[in-house]
């Protein structure tokens, strides 16, 4: 018995020594990364971070992180390049995989929250600042610096893919088994760029609310800015948003057989805002004729005033009163008086298109006829601007050939990226299958071929990558946590199952928490169905429970009826 106890003590001692040696070895390995030679790259620091809370350089506090090796570096593939990046590698418990995360808006910083998300899931992870040190709402880095536009467009993504994987392999002494990418908003654009330009880099890609058609999307922002602020008489105050939302829901909410404050498929009901016209004195419950024209223009989206041709899409009216949607992006609020659309549009056009800088830019001088082509073709390092920053290529043949899988999702009430654009992009990929596969003879077959590697989820009631009255808790980068980390509830787990087990995601059960706070309980659950399916209540059982919904096929296309040939013009656009 004494011998047995002694043996146990010896084994425990050896295990403790082994753990210490392992930790010391990992520390040495992390520090050794400083000497790693990478093309056009300098490693600034490589340090071990203990488990627990971590305060990032920007002040972000990330709780409950595992111990990790934090690598900070900068790449300079060209003389005017300054691409910052970070790579975080678990010191123990690595899941053997790599997850790169995307940027936000104009980038300019490291998204530490996204790195923490990936690290907690066991991944080695990396991201970039997009090639500059401004801020997410500042595009001044681009003026007079075509190389920096190129870096922000796709070069920063490319160098971080290369450096991230090299550093992970050097630290762990093995290549990642599977590689994934997850990005939201501009990071969603990064995700599509990865599939289109670098098809061999990732096994699985998740694109959340991607601003894929960036140039045309910018015209949507400018259009709503012109409509909203073109004249004081036409401006819609935030106080009127509840009346607009109520009128839109009154017309359309019950069309999906559940009057629950969420419109499952806005394509099935075209809201007629004329019901809001004031019949007497103006109040917050109605709109004047100029305000009605403003609303109609924002909903319809930008058009060429000469030809009536659609430039891009507008925004949906069914959650406009939800905080963080229209009051932040379109009507403006105390923090952003002119609205986020004005900020993004002015920064983009002033610094990437016209090179005036913000102080010298007059948004009323942008011509919705001639300046669309001017913006698309603006020379950037020998390429048209649109080809550098847009992620609209329908050719995913390389990504498909390497057996890659991709999920794109977007909220139907997104106030930043028009959600119908996601359908148009997806349908362009479906159409491309006809070109890549001559044996396809039916539209249904082209769709089925696309669904083998690429699926689109339209999320009812969700705003820009989170928020809104819809069920937005399904494991998004910036959303509330999923009910469970499994393929039935969590989008990343669903992607892992698709890539690693061949189980394609048919539906994902999303949740809505009270005030989007998991501690306050679940308000409802709802299945997210992959396009062209949508969730339909079976007619019995609680309409707040996902088990009482089925996914059924719906018609395809951004519009189910004929889109208006000529959308109403903002008064400011009419005079140009």
From Swiss-Prot:
Q: Which residues cross the membrane?
A: none
Question: Which domain of life does the UniProt lineage start with?
Answer: Bacteria
N-terminal signal peptide: 1-28
How would you classify this enzyme at the top EC level? hydrolase
Please list the residues that bind Ca(2+).
253, 256, 260, 262
Name the SUPFAM superfamilies on file. alpha/beta-Hydrolases
One GO MF term on file is: metal ion binding
Please report any disulfide bonds recorded for this protein chain, giving both cysteine positions: 252-269, 278-286, 529-551
Q: What is this protein called?
A: Uncharacterized esterase XCC2094
Task: Give the organism's phylogenetic lineage.
Answer: Bacteria, Pseudomonadati, Pseudomonadota, Gammaproteobacteria, Lysobacterales
């Amino acid at each position: 018995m004494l011998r047995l106890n002694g043996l146990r003590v010896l084994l425990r001692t050896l295990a403790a020594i082994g753990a210490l040696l392992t930790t010391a070895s990992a520390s040495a390995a992390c520090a050794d990364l400083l000497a790693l030679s990478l093309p056009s790259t300098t490693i600034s620091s490589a340090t071990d971070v203990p488990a627990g809370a971590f305060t990032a350089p920007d002040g972000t506090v990330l709780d409950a992180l595992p111990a990790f090796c934090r690598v900070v570096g900068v790449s300079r593939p060209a003389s005017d390049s300054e691409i910052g990046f970070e790579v975080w590698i678990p010191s123990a418990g690595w899941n053997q995989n790599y997850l790169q995360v995307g940027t936000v808006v104009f980038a300019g910083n490291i998204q530490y929250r996204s790195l923490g998300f990936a690290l907690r899931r066991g991944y080695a992870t990396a991201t970039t600042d997009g090639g500059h040190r401004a801020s997410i709402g500042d595009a001044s880095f681009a003026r007079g610096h075509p190389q920096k536009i190129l870096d922000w467009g796709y070069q920063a993504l490319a160098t971080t893919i290369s450096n991230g994987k090299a550093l992970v392999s050097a630290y762990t002494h093995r290549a990642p088994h599977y590689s994934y990418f997850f990005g939201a908003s501009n990071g969603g654009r990064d995700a599509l760029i990865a599939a289109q330009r670098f098809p061999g880099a990732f096994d699985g890609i998740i694109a959340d609310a991607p601003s894929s058609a960036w140039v045309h999307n910018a015209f949507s922002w400018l259009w709503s800015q012109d409509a909203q602020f073109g004249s004081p008489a036409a401006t819609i105050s935030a106080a009127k948003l509840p009346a607009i939302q109520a009128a839109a829901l009154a017309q359309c909410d019950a069309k999906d057989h559940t009057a629950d404050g969420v419109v499952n498929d806005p394509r099935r009901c075209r809201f007629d805002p004329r019901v809001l016209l004031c019949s007497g004195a103006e109040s917050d419950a109605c709109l004047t004729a100029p305000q009605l024209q403003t609303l109609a223009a924002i909903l319809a989206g930008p058009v060429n005033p000469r030809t009536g041709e659609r430039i891009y899409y507008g925004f949906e009216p069914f959650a406009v009163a939800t905080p963080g949607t229209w009051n932040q992006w379109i009507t403006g609020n105390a923090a952003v008086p002119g609205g986020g659309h004005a900020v993004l549009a002015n920064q983009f056009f002033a610094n990437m298109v016209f090179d005036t800088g913000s102080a010298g830019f007059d948004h009323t001088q942008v011509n919705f006829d001639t300046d669309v082509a001017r913006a698309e073709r603006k020379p950037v390092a020998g390429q048209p601007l649109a080809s550098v920053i847009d992620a609209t290529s329908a050719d995913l043949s390389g990504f498909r050939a390497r057996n890659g899988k991709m999920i794109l999702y977007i909220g139907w009430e997104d106030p930043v990226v028009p959600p119908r654009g996601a359908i148009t992009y997806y349908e362009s990929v479906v159409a491309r299958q006809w070109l890549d596969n001559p044996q396809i003879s039916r539209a249904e077959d082209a769709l089925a071929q696309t669904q083998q590697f690429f699926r689109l989820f339209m999320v009812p009631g969700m705003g820009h990558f989170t928020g809104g009255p819809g069920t937005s808790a399904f494991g998004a980068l910036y959303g509330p946590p999923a009910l469970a980390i499994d393929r039935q509830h969590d989008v990343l787990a669903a992607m892992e199952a698709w890539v690693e087990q061949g189980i394609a995601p048919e539906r994902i059960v999303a949740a809505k928490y009270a005030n989007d706070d998991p501690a306050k309980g679940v308000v409802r659950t709802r299945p997210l169905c992959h396009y062209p399916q949508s969730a339909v209540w079976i007619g019995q059982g609680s309409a707040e429970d996902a088990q009482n919904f089925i996914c059924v096929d719906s018609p395809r296309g951004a519009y189910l009826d004929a889109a208006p040939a000529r959308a109403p013009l903002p008064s400011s656009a009419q005079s140009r």
